[in-house]
UniProtKB/Swiss-Prot annotation:
Subunit structure: The 20S proteasome core is composed of 14 alpha and 14 beta subunits that assemble into four stacked heptameric rings, resulting in a barrel-shaped structure. The two inner rings, each composed of seven catalytic beta subunits, are sandwiched by two outer rings, each composed of seven alpha subunits. The catalytic chamber with the active sites is on the inside of the barrel. Has probably a gated structure, the ends of the cylinder being occluded by the N-termini of the alpha-subunits. Is likely capped at one or both ends by the proteasome regulatory ATPase, PAN.
Species assigned in the record: Archaeoglobus fulgidus (strain ATCC 49558 / DSM 4304 / JCM 9628 / NBRC 100126 / VC-16)
Activation/inhibition comment: The formation of the proteasomal ATPase PAN-20S proteasome complex, via the docking of the C-termini of PAN into the intersubunit pockets in the alpha-rings, triggers opening of the gate for substrate entry. Interconversion between the open-gate and close-gate conformations leads to a dynamic regulation of the 20S proteasome proteolysis activity.
One Gene Ontology cellular component: cytoplasm
CDD domains for the chain: proteasome_alpha_archeal (cd03756)
InterPro entries hit by this protein: Ntn_hydrolases_N, Proteasome_alpha, Proteasome_alpha-type, Proteasome_asu_arc, Proteasome_asu_N, Proteasome_sua/b
GO BP terms, alphabetized: proteasomal protein catabolic process; ubiquitin-dependent protein catabolic process
Gene3D superfamilies assigned: Glutamine Phosphoribosylpyrophosphate, subunit 1, domain 1
Protein name: Proteasome subunit alpha
Keywords from the named record: Cytoplasm, Proteasome
PROSITE patterns found in the cross-reference section: PROTEASOME_ALPHA_1, PROTEASOME_ALPHA_2
Taxonomic lineage from the root: Archaea, Methanobacteriati, Methanobacteriota, Archaeoglobi, Archaeoglobales
Length: 246
């Protein structure tokens, strides 16, 4: 005799007869409702782009953070529940520091992503907890640029270019047509911004976009100010206008 669906909903540790964990699926829905975040690799490094439009004129825009420094050579973008994201970002920073103290060397991007996925997976198999309603894009440079996505289930995937959040489908479709392995840094930046514009179906405003990157030559995370972003946004908006007319 099978439990009604409500029974499987309440029990995170119980599979439904067709092999589903409903709470994990609901956590993925929380990510789909989140703001879009994009990651893209290029020859010179890896770039993260996040939508940080505010929903109220009373909100201090400077307090909204969507891209985080994890270590000198690693950054992360989030989409989903903000409080859950903060917990995972803190966890990632701690793991990076533990590795430095233990081995006297920086953690690799893949190892950090695996540790975060292991942590997330634990919250899918124990009673009294729920899955994290957030996905992370973890980006950085070891010997070469790396870009990983962590799923609420704890799954880990590596990408050349991808997105999380409500604009994922539009961005993925665009990247599948336009992405190339030999992109320069500037071209990758513009391509990522065009994808963001298509995801929100609007031209971009530099103040509403957060951008961070790590380059191969110095392996150091850097943020892009709205002033520095303007020439890239102007180039992207020309293409966005063309594509939105079609």
């Amino acid at each position: 005799m099978h439990l009604p669906q409500m029974g499987y909903d309440r029990a995170i540790t119980v599979f439904s007869p067709d092999g589903r964990l409903f709470q994990v699926e609901y956590a993925r829905e929380a990510v789909k409702r989140g703001a879009t975040a994009i990651g893209i690799k290029c020859k010179e490094g890896v770039i993260l782009i996040a939508d940080k439009r505010v929903g109220s004129k009373l909100l201090e825009a400077d307090t909204i953070e969507k891209i985080y420094k994890i270590d000198e050579h690693i950054c992360a973008a989030t989409s989903g529940l903000v409080a859950d994201a903060r917990v995972l970002i803190d966890r990632a920073r701690i793991e990076a520091q533990i590795n430095r103290l233990t081995y006297d060397e920086p953690i690799t991007v893949k190892e950090l992503a695996k540790k975060i996925c292991d942590f997330k997976q634990q919250y899918t198999q124990y009673g009294g907890v729920r899955p994290f309603g957030v996905s992370l894009l973890i980006a950085g440079v070891d010997e070469v640029p790396k870009l990983y996505e962590t799923d609420p289930s704890g799954a880990l995937l590596e990408y050349k270019a991808t997105a999380i959040g409500m604009g994922r489908n539009a961005v993925t479709e665009f990247f599948e047509k336009e992405y190339r392995d030999d992109l320069s840094f500037d071209d990758a930046m513009v391509l990522g911004l065009v994808a963001m514009g298509l995801s929100i179906e609007s031209e971009l405003v530099p103040e509403n976009i957060e951008v961070g990157y790590v380059k191969v030559d110095d392996r150091t995370f850097k943020e892009v100010s709205p002033e520095e972003l303007k020439p890239y946004v102007e180039r992207a908006n020309e293409r966005i206008r063309e594509l939105l007319k079609k």
